Amino acid sequence: MTEISVKLPHEPYNIQVTVSSQEQVQDVRQSIVELPGTFQYTSFHLEHNGTRINDYIELSEVKDIQANSEVVLVEDPYTEKEARMHVIRIRELIGAAGDRVDNLHGICAGLSLHDSVAAGEQLTDTKEGERGVVRDHALVDYDMTAPPVLQTILPRAQPSLPKTVKAISLSPWNPPPYHLRQRGHLLYLQVTTNEGEQHQITSHVSGFFVNKSSNAKFDPFPRPAPKNYSAHSLLTLISMLSPSFDASFKALQESNNKKDLLTTFPFQNSIPKNPWLVPPTSSAVTAHQSDITRSQENCLIFGVDNSETLRDWNEEFQSTRELPRETVQDKVSRERLTSKLFADYNDAAARGAVLVAKGEIAPLNPTEGKDAQIFVYNNIFFSFGADGVGTFASEGGDEAARVAVGKDVVGAKAVNQLDIPGLFTPGTVVVDYLGKRLVGQSIVPGIFKQREPGEHQIDYGGVEGKEVVAEHKDFVPVFEKLSASLRVKKHPVWDKEGKRHDLEGSVETKGLLGTDGRKYVLDLYRITPLDVAWSEDAEGHEPYPHRMSVLRLELVELYWRYKMGQYVKAEVQKRKTAKREAEKTKAVEAQNEDKAELLSTSDPGEGENKAVASEQERVDISAFKLALNPDVFSGQVPQTDEEKEEWAQDEKEVRSACDHLISKVIPELIQDLHDGDVGFPMDGESLTQLLHKRGINVRYLGKLAKLSQAKGQRLLALTALLIQEMVSRSFKHIANRYLRYLPSPFTASCVSHLLNCFLGAEVNSNPRPEIDEELREIYPEGDFSFEKVTPTSLKGDIEKQIKIRFRFNLEPKWTSSLKHLQLLRDISIKLGLQIGAREFAFERSQIKSQEHSPEPSSTHSSQDERGKRKKKKGSNSDSPSRVAASPRPVVTFVPEDILNIVPLVKDASPRSALAEEALEAGRISIMQNQKEIGQELILESLSLHEQIYGILHPEVAKLYHQLSMLYYQTDEKEAAVELARKAVIVTERTMGVDSADTILSYLNLSLFEHASGNTHTALIYIRHALELWKIIYGSHHPDSITTMNNAAVMLQHLKKYPDSRKWFEASLTVCEGLFGRQSINTATILFQLAQALALDQDSKAAVNRMRDAYNIFLNELGPNDRNTKEAESWLEQLTQNAVSIAKHAKDIQARRLRRTNLSPRMTIGTKPQPQVGQNAPATTNGATSKSIGLDSRSIDELLKFIEGGGESRSPRSKQKKRAAASNPKLRGSKQSTVQTA
């Protein structure tokens, strides 16, 4: 990194910019635009030595440029587009831009709560005028058994920002007439200053000036002196016009600087996460403000004719793929463009899909049935994920079509990731919205072309189902590469006439030669074989909804690795056998030789043996071949005996892969969760991620639940989570069925009624839907079947769906064990609901707090619009819609609670291979103790991630999380805290303020803050994480044992011994519930609790707890185990002199906690959570100071035990032969922590 000097045309006239020689000049431009002294510049170029610098070259390519070189910023004339962008930017800079309302980004999209949490803002209600009690520490009043506080995930009300201008908008005189456009007029603006003066401004190619127009008179030419204000930047012009502007703008900047930049940074390469729970319409946070420019923004962004939105997406995708990839910089530029292009396309496709779903776009084939209609909008081709033309009639109709398009986007993502030269895919996005599934694809040239008679529409693969099969020699090489990467076997298929065709891929995977000469691969929903184990296990079960149940790509890869491992073992065994035979032969020959000769050859013989051993370590796997035939079990009929034999072999291999899933992968996952070897999932999303990573399809939730139940108490939490996920998924399918053909104005009524029948059945066992009959009359073809749903029918429907989809039978009283809030959250996420926050009554006992259901809080709600219309069905004449004095019937949800529904987007964006390679290389270097090289590579990976993805992206959030862990392990705590803080904010904004990843990020941040000496801040983060945990899971999550222990240790560090003791006791309660009273895990916590009790001067209880720990260790591990001996030693000492020991324990604790870079190892055998004392072995070795009256050896060993020292690891971890504490497994590795695999 070097500095260059930038000479400016205005104050401050010169700035220093830190740059990298690998950066493009446009990145340097962006850096200048974002600096406080230069952000008014938008239309400019840079010059060096009087020569203009091209924006699209690397800085290193600029002639004679070096460190401290001077670059000159030269203002350019504006174009109309640049003028519009300048106005938008200045509006945002001066705080004049209101919230945008669009179809894609919902309420509070991309929300971050970090700044509010870090400031320690309390959520407890305090009456107006009362001051909140100053807390000693964040956990002082925390109740672990209290119900969750919904305000935890809501944005806090912020103080109003300083106002810089009253309004800035397009003038009523805009756009300029033709004759003035030719004279350089671009836009006409209207600015009202804080002083109340209104100014008409002309945007000219040369800059901005105040004109002589008024609201009634058009005169867009400059005012005469002395009021002839003009400037190149609108920001500068406004500061000339408004005396108060500079002061208010400075105050606005100071206010913005208090926030972390990442919390307000705009999204560029990803779609922001929409929270499921949002403030109600009455909240100041979401109040709708008057803003004339909001309706003008589309014009400002896209221009008057909207032509800038019309992009040739397909050509952009394919030409980007064809960019050079020889050098590293080529690859960076290519991947960066690819990432941006996919982000833009996903955004455009999602917006278009929403318009199609709402009926805003006219179909190309209006005479066809609704499901068969196709649409083109913004150069994107849209169709419904339904079987409108009978393509999937034999596979399951609409259900099969819905699954197929979902699998297609996964397949497209896999092909995009492989990035095979010469093979192209159309841009593909699947959007679920209002019960409909829509597919958006870029238009492949020639796909709509009418072919000559006798020519097929498709050039390679099945043309009309499987009856006609096309072949094309040009597709063989690229499909061969694709199939090799996806482990797909070249195999024969037969058309309807029995003719054989040898295909590289599935008959369902099609190749199309576009009119642009490129080879496209389409329909990638069958790149893996059918799951024959699932389809053949249908006996005794309801018929599955479709025949599209295929294996996951992850499973195929795992199976390939498993078989390769077997192959390597077999090869090694062969070599060992061959070596033994050779040795025998040599021994026989040696008997006939002279002893001296034997001695003379002994040394070379040893060298030879070493060479053989070395050779054994290297097994050539090029001879290993494993590929699966994706078309077996799908109706293909081999013709000859040879073909039948080959087909039978293919079927056998696929059965073997399916069996691997059933008999090995699934049981191993259950065992790993039982043993605590993987992070325990917290909600449906994290559970699904874990299953998919292991190659397990979601349809196996029922099987997993049965295996989990068989494991008993230890996996009770997992069983409940699996059942909850089955229930929420079944509800999603049912809701989608009712929403699919329902007119959109009734969506809120439908959703609220279904939720009342499901989650509010105890409050009202016979809820009635609220429907405006007059509005209903104008939709005679709408499907209003949801009206007939009752709690009983819905319960039966859910049970039926679970039987069909997951082959699992719920217990008769399953509804009594539901976690209502968690289910509401899961359902909302799966359907894209945004619900207005309030206290929902799920049980009769909660009704007391609300005598009747809440009335709409918004003054512009539906009943005001239709107050005089017919009464709603199910409501009497005293309905609050008509007579405000009377309550509605008591129900849990009302239509006004459903504030919005957002589209759910599945995209095919590939990850950056270059950034991942750099990260992996860095990890390996650090593991090999090459710290400097490793850190350099990791920083390079971070730079690549940020360049390619932009800062706000889930992949960048994961990297920040991983890097923070790596820096913590290498004892660079400040860097670890900074990266962990970034990880929290980016995770909140891209994955959700209450996602499982967000909780992990907050917990890690708390550990790093504590290690850096900021224990009070650490406790604030722990409190927030625990509140989030309550919302997404409830209490007593298996991982919470570790967090509670960490909190207890932090409180000990603050010398809050009574509070610390409470947290150890809470941890013990959860541990006993999960692992039983007599488990080693419980004994480990009892040991720590005894310490805490001694510190709290409760000597009697300390002795009792230590005795309990000793007895468990003795029974479970025997008298000779180190843990038993330590517990016995401490028990004796505590018993001999309890008071004295308490005093000495205090001294020990003081010495231990002064070393803030460590804390107890808290995994206690439950799960691989990031441990506070990760580098404890290195730091505890020096703790040799002796304590009076205690055996120093015992004390040091105890320190190692409770801090996670290497010798005193958790007993069960010894039995499991796990890695030493210096290389611990990290919690959440399934999602977002360091993985070295």
Curated annotation (Swiss-Prot):
Positions of TPR repeats: 957-990, 999-1032, 1041-1074
One Pfam family from the record: CLU_N
Biased composition (Polar residues): 1156-1187
Keywords: Cytoplasm, Repeat, TPR repeat
GO biological process: intracellular distribution of mitochondria; mitochondrion organization
InterPro entries: CLU-central (IPR033646), CLU_dom (IPR025697), CLU_N (IPR028275), CLU_prot (IPR027523), GSKIP_dom_sf (IPR023231), TPR-like_helical_dom_sf (IPR011990), TPR_rpt (IPR019734)
Renumbered residue ranges of the record's region Disordered: 575-614, 845-886, 1152-1189, 1201-1237
Bias (Basic and acidic residues) ranges: 575-597, 845-854
Entry GO MF terms: mRNA binding
Subunit structure: May associate with the eukaryotic translation initiation factor 3 (eIF-3) complex.
Described purpose of this protein according to its UniProt entry: mRNA-binding protein involved in proper cytoplasmic distribution of mitochondria.
Name of protein: Clustered mitochondria protein homolog
